Amino acid sequence: MQKLTILGATGSIGASTLKVVEQNPELFSIVALAASTNVEKMVALCRKWQPKYAVMADKAAALALQSELASVSPSTEVLGGVDALCHVSALEEVDSVMAAIVGAAGLLPTMAAVKAGKRVLLANKEALVMSGQLFIDAVEEHGAELLPVDSEHNAIFQCLPQQVQTSLGRCNLEEHGISSILLTGSGGPFRYTDIAELEKVTPAQAIAHPNWSMGPKISVDSATMMNKGLEYIEAKWLFNAAREQLKVIIHPQSVIHSMVQYRDGSVLAQMGEPDMATPIALTMSYPSRVDAGVKPLDVTQVGELTFLQPDFARYPCLKLAIDACYEGQHATTALNAANEVAVDAFLNNRLGFTDIARINESVLNKITASHKSENVNSLESLIELDRMSRTIALEFLRERS
C-alpha cells in the first residue's frame, strides 16, 4: 500500500490523482490533502477521503476549513500555511508526494518532499523552472525519486531506456543513442487565428482549450505557448538536454504526447487519449502499470496526425522561454515570475492578451541586465529574485494602465 500526500488536491491534477486512487483502492491510500484557498472543494474531498491531514496554504482558509470539518471529518487534522505544506510533504509515513500546486507557491513543499527522500510525482513545472540545478542536486543528495507527471515529459520518459529513466537530471542522452527529444504541443486555441486579431482575445476565449481540461493559468499559458516554453525548460533539466537535442513541434490533435529520436533513425512516440490520469497512474505505480480508468485510444478514429514548426511571431512567449533557458537560472526564474503576474492581470481584465509577452520580455531584459546565474545559488536567493521580478512586473503593469 503506497501512502500519498496530494499537493494541489482541489485542482485538475488532484482530481485525476484521486480518480486513479479510487480505481486502485488496494494499492494507494491518502494521508494528506493540500490546497491553496478552495475550502468548499476541500470539505467535499475530506468528507469522501477522510485524510489524516488537510492543509490550506492560506491560513484564513485553514480556519474556515477547520470549522467546516468538525462535523464531516472530525478525525482530520487541519493545518495552514507554507510550513504546513512542507510538513505534510515530508511526513515519515508518506511514500509519494503528488506535487501539483500551480506556480512558484509549489516550490518549497516540493523541495521539502525531495529533501525527505520521497518519490516525487512532479506536476509543478515551476519548481524546476525556478530552481533547476539546485533541484536536481537535491534529488541526488537526498536519494529522492523524481517522476514527471506532465503529459509531455511523461511521454518522453516512457520512450527512454530504463537507465535514463532512473538517472533523470544527470543522464547522458548521447551515451544511450538518443539524438533529440521532440516536445509536442497543440498550439492552443489560436493557432489559426490572424495574428492581428490576437490583441482582442478575451480571458474566456483563452481558457477554452481545444483538447485538454486544465485550470485557467495553464490554459492561458497554453494559448500563449508559455506552457510549452516552461515545459522546454523543465525538459532541459529532467533529461539533461543540450539546445540541439531539444525541439518543439506543433501537433494540433494532441494524440502523440511527445517523441524521442534515436541515432539509428528510430522515432519512438507515446500516444493516448488526452487524459492526465494516464501519466499520473504511471508515476504512481512505476515501474508497474495499473488501471487508470482511461478509455483506450481507438487509433482507427484518430484520422490524420499533423506536425508543424512553431511560429515565434505568433508565440513570442515560447521564444522568450527557450532563450531564457540557455541564458541561465536567473532568466528562467524571472520569466516565470513575470508570467504569473502578467497572466493573473490578463485573467482579471487588467492586461491585453498580447501584452503578456511584452511584460515578460520587459522583466526579462531588466533582470538579465543586472543579474547573472551565479547570483542565484541558493533557494533563498531564488525566492528573492522571484519576489523582485514580480515587483518589476507590477511596476510595468502600472505604467501600462
Swiss-Prot record:
1-deoxy-D-xylulose 5-phosphate binds at residues 125, 151-152, 186, 209, 222, 227-228, 231. It is an enzyme of class 1 (oxidoreductase). Its cofactor is Mg(2+); Mn(2+). Mn(2+) binds at residues 150, 152, 231. Pathway: Isoprenoid biosynthesis; isopentenyl diphosphate biosynthesis via DXP pathway; isopentenyl diphosphate from 1-deoxy-D-xylulose 5-phosphate: step 1/6. Keywords: Isoprene biosynthesis, Manganese, Metal-binding, NADP, Oxidoreductase. It catalyses: 2-C-methyl-D-erythritol 4-phosphate + NADP(+) = 1-deoxy-D-xylulose 5-phosphate + NADPH + H(+). Belongs to the DXR family. This is 1-deoxy-D-xylulose 5-phosphate reductoisomerase. It comes from Vibrio campbellii (strain ATCC BAA-1116). The lineage of its organism: Bacteria, Pseudomonadati, Pseudomonadota, Gammaproteobacteria, Vibrionales.
